[in-house]
Design a protein with these regions (language model features):
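Short loop segments and helix-boundary regions at transmembrane helix junctions
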Residues: 55-138, 234-248, 261-270, 290
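Hydrophobic alpha-helical transmembrane segments
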Residues: 40-44, 88-93, 115-119, 158-163, ...
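Helix-loop-helix "hairpin" substructures at the membrane interface of multi-pass membrane proteins
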Residues: 46, 157-230
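Loop-to-helix entry region at the N-terminal start of transmembrane alpha-helices
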Residues: 34-42, 142-169
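Membrane-interfacial amphipathic/re-entrant helices at transmembrane-helix boundaries
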Residues: 1-47, 303
Length: 304
């Protein structure tokens, strides 16, 4: 059902007709819709951070970790919800604890990272469901956790999200060299004196915090797309690492902006719309990328 809000002489009914960018800007500045600019800020910041972290996740071939961490933060979100605390802080605490456990357990080379992650995230998600089931009316809250809620972001979470985003970006900047070295060749990096455990821990914590920042806007189920799709698209469009690290967050932030605009105009779920926009960008890059697209490869094959 669409929500109709009267604002001055205009009736805001996003589902009634498609809003122009100008009307969307008016809605952003409408005091009666204070949640909308807040949601836009969180969506863009979350996409930017996930795009930055996702570069390392894609290069290391660890797409599964995003889904795993999204599930592993669920107990923290559930406890914070039941206790009436900050969902961002609760999820961040659970995510960091899980990141530390994964980093420590993954040092045992008899167990691959995906095995360790799979064991931990299933147990953590089950624990979160058990905890939130104790809360009255938990079904609606569970849906918000799984698929996001554009109206469910309190103003008190904005400074926490902004602080977390700055922390993640700073940590990625400071740990860039060791993380890349471990990604390219773990054993060579270890032999060169790189602290492999610290590099792994930095990446896992960055992923956990990026997921927590994103989960309220895009939801627990779809957060993997925000983490992987912009980076995968950038990977198709460029060859240099630094270019990829600039393009990926730019694509993510643009997808967050366009996705929120379309979801508000069409009255459809925000998280799903953002993911569809990013997926469309990936498909276009997969087909039309100048060097690595399908058409470019076919042309080279014909010329060869």
């Amino acid at each position: 059902m669409s929500t109709v809000i009267h604002a001055g002489s205009r009736v805001l009914a996003p589902a009634a007709d498609f809003l122009s960018p100008y009307d969307f800007f008016r809605d952003l500045t409408n005091p009666a819709l204070a949640f909308l600019p807040r949601a836009l800020l969180i969506a863009v910041v979350a996409a930017l951070v996930c795009g930055s972290v996702g570069v390392h996740v894609v290069l290391r071939g660890m797409a599964f970790i995003g889904d795993a961490v999204a599930h592993s933060v669920f107990p923290g979100l559930a406890i914070a919800f039941v206790c009436g605390g900050s969902l961002v802080l609760g999820g961040a605490l659970a995510g960091v604890v899980t990141a530390v456990l994964v980093a420590l357990l993954a040092q045992n080379r008899r167990l691959k990272e995906d095995s360790v992650i799979g064991v931990l995230f299933v147990g953590a998600f089950a624990l979160g469901v058990a905890i939130i089931a104790r809360a009255p009316g938990y079904a609606g809250s569970l849906q918000d956790f799984l698929f996001g809620s554009i109206t469910g972001i309190p103003a008190s979470d904005v400074p926490v999200v902004m602080g977390g985003a700055l922390f993640v970006l700073l940590m990625l900047f400071l740990a860039h060299r060791p993380i890349v070295a471990v990604t390219l060749d773990r054993e060579s990096a270890r032999a060169a004196g790189v602290h492999v455990l610290l590099a792994d821990l930095s990446l896992y914590v960055a992923v956990a915090l990026a997921v927590v920042i994103s989960v309220q806007t895009i939801g627990n189920v779809l957060v993997l797309a925000l983490l992987v799709t912009p980076a995968a698209t950038a990977r198709l469009l460029c060859d240099r690492l630094w270019t990829m690290m600039i393009l990926s967050p730019a694509l993510g932030a643009s997808g967050g902006l366009v996705g929120l605009y379309l979801s508000w105009s069409l009255d459809v779920p925000t998280g799903a719309t953002i993911v569809l926009v990013l997926t469309a960008c990936f498909v276009l890059a997969w087909v039309f990328a100048p060097r690595h697209g399908v058409l470019a490869r076919r042309l080279r094959e014909k010329r060869g």
